[in-house]
Amino acid sequence: MLTIGDSRFSSRLFTGTGKFASADQMLAALAASGSQLVTLAMKRLDLKAGFDDILAPIRQSGVKLLPNTSGARNAKEAIFAAELAREVLGTSWVKLEIHPDPKYLMPDPIETFNAAKVLCERGFTVLPYVHADPVLCRNLESVGCAAVMPLGSPIGSNRGLETAAFLKIIIEQAKVPVVVDAGIGSPSQAMAAMEMGASAVLVNTAIAASRDPVKMALCFADAVVTGRKAYEAGLAQVHQRAIGTSPQQALTAFLSE
């Protein structure tokens, strides 16, 4: 079981809600994934209508909702979005996202840290989306973040774990869960993240943009479980030279008789 804040999860696959062809397709993929934590951008909700055709079915499914502050350009906007989510959705959980550059969607480390500090002081359960920066992740942990969410590669790029070397350092040092977020484009990449010791992965585009999102969600669910089992089993050590599986000396002794 994975514990984040005051909640426990049996599934280590977290999912997003964007880019699906329809709400029905999203719900079917969500069910297939087995995910128990789903992130949703506050900017996508129709709060004036009093009913949202995306939010309502997600709540009915029983999964935990993780509102995110995607679209916020600075700490002030992100804090406002988080407070709005707590008031409207009744949750103090927030995925903190601040990316002022609309082209590359790179998270702003300074504004993210400043917002995280304020939100933690106000009683939020903060999961910040950040660069794979070990120092930043340690600092975010120190101000009270419940988990850290370093990127594997840019959002929606499907380029995989380009930051693998830094993710390994973050995982080694962290005292809170590490959720690899952004850029995971295939089940094998999700498995690789889990094999290196990530607590969980968050996947959206790779599922939603696939030809069959429901089948792809099943594939990701299996990959995450397998990757976690491999990590717990302990991967064999990597060597730079060949190491035979049979004793060579015994063979040469036999031939010389």
Swiss-Prot record:
Signal among keywords: no
EC annotation from Swiss-Prot or TrEMBL: 2.8.1.10
EC class: transferase
Gene Ontology biological-process entries: thiamine diphosphate biosynthetic process
Binding residues for 1-deoxy-D-xylulose 5-phosphate: 156, 182-183, 204-205
InterPro entries listed in its UniProt record: Aldolase_TIM, Thiazole_synthase_ThiG, ThiG
Superkingdom per UniProt: Bacteria
Pathway: Cofactor biosynthesis; thiamine diphosphate biosynthesis
Keywords assigned: Cytoplasm, Schiff base, Thiamine biosynthesis, Transferase
Record Gene3D superfamilies: Aldolase class I
SUPFAM superfamilies documented for this protein: ThiG-like
Any one GO cellular component localisation term in the record: cytoplasm
Signal peptide: none
Catalytic residues in the record: 95
Similarity comment: Belongs to the ThiG family.
Subunit structure: Homotetramer. Forms heterodimers with either ThiH or ThiS.
Protein name per its UniProtKB record: Thiazole synthase
Organism: Shewanella loihica (strain ATCC BAA-1088 / PV-4)
Name of encoding gene: thiG
